[in-house]
Amino acid sequence: MRIAAILVAGGSGSRFGSDIPKQFLPVGGKPLIRHGAERLSAKVDLLQPVGCADDIAPLLQGLDHLPIVDGGKERQDSVRAGLEALVPYAPDIVLIHDAARPYFPDHTIEDLIEALQIHDGAIPAVPVADTLKRAAGNIIDSTVPREGLYRAQTPQAFKFSVLLALHRDHPGGATDDAALLDQAGHSVALVPGAEDNIKVTYPADLARVERSMSISMIPRIGTGYDVHAFETGRKLILCGIEVPHHQGLAGHSDADVGIHALCDAIYGALAEGDIGRHFPPTEASWKDADSARFLRHAAERIAARGGFLANADLTLICEKPKITPHAPAMIARLAELLGVSIDKISVKATTSEKLGFTGREEGIAAQAAVIIMIPA
């Protein structure tokens, strides 16, 4: 069974009152859109973002997703564009998720998929708890019974072929996809939603999300250390870039000592072992491998745990080559691989004052520390 997700990132956020669309505003240390994208990418086979590629692409760096497609004037136009883009991949199930919803529980997708064994669609929903009033202006006209009323949330799940056919048969669709199925006589199930699954529409919503995340996320600290000896005849790769030097570093992979230390720090913070556990040096498949693959995997593990990288601090220890001239490029590359902004990454260098193997210019050592926020 192949599962795809459409991440709808259109809309200008006019009700939010900001020049920046709400889905691009920072919350919990990263753009709003990235929270949902990371949670989806850890659960589905295909992630299809819909919106302005120039705006979205930088915010999704490091995540595995399909080429971004342009959205439409209305939300349903954007969903249709995402569905058509998924046709060549023939998914069995498609999830539709609003980029303005940064959080949903891990069990939501499992609940939705289970419901699709019987129904053509399923949505998470929360029963309406407040008393509802119908009014004309500021004058109450009547009380609306709340029994049987629910607040719909996303992600919503549908059988791909059913939803695609309905969008093609009804251009413009309905106000939402569940309504489209309901109007066509298809059954749509409700699964339990979550009060924390907040859609950011107004400025106060952003504050609610920030408070919720600060309460539900806890910091995890990890450290990593690695060392490689110099070896003639190899390129010197440090923090994902090639550094001019007359020697490279010896190792089974490309021997990127900086990335290796950083990976160990991340795995340590997640209590998931070290780089050797995930990429054993005894396996031929990792011979001369680009260590960027290792760091991308570490970033994916953060996302799979529903967390985010708060910051990373890396120190390279060597007499030569000089690191400082290359530090900005190193920071940019690490930020790209981890899918974070450059202000979350620090790369600096020191020497051992001519002492030890680094002092004798026999190799390079690296020390890393990270703080990762994960759900409590």
Swiss-Prot record:
Superkingdom to which the source organism belongs: Bacteria
Catalytic activity of the protein: 2-C-methyl-D-erythritol 4-phosphate + CTP + H(+) = 4-CDP-2-C-methyl-D-erythritol + diphosphate; 4-CDP-2-C-methyl-D-erythritol 2-phosphate = 2-C-methyl-D-erythritol 2,4-cyclic diphosphate + CMP
Pathway: Isoprenoid biosynthesis; isopentenyl diphosphate biosynthesis via DXP pathway; isopentenyl diphosphate from 1-deoxy-D-xylulose 5-phosphate: step 2/6; Isoprenoid biosynthesis; isopentenyl diphosphate biosynthesis via DXP pathway; isopentenyl diphosphate from 1-deoxy-D-xylulose 5-phosphate: step 4/6
Site (Transition state stabilizer): R15, K22, H252, T351
Chain spans, region 2-C-methyl-D-erythritol 4-phosphate cytidylyltransferase: 1-220
Needed cofactors: a divalent metal cation
Function noted in UniProt: Bifunctional enzyme that catalyzes the formation of 4-diphosphocytidyl-2-C-methyl-D-erythritol from CTP and 2-C-methyl-D-erythritol 4-phosphate (MEP) (IspD), and catalyzes the conversion of 4-diphosphocytidyl-2-C-methyl-D-erythritol 2-phosphate (CDP-ME2P) to 2-C-methyl-D-erythritol 2,4-cyclodiphosphate (ME-CPP) with a corresponding release of cytidine 5-monophosphate (CMP) (IspF).
NCBIfam families: ispD (TIGR00453), ispF (TIGR00151), PRK09382.1 (NF006899)
Protein name: Bifunctional enzyme IspD/IspF
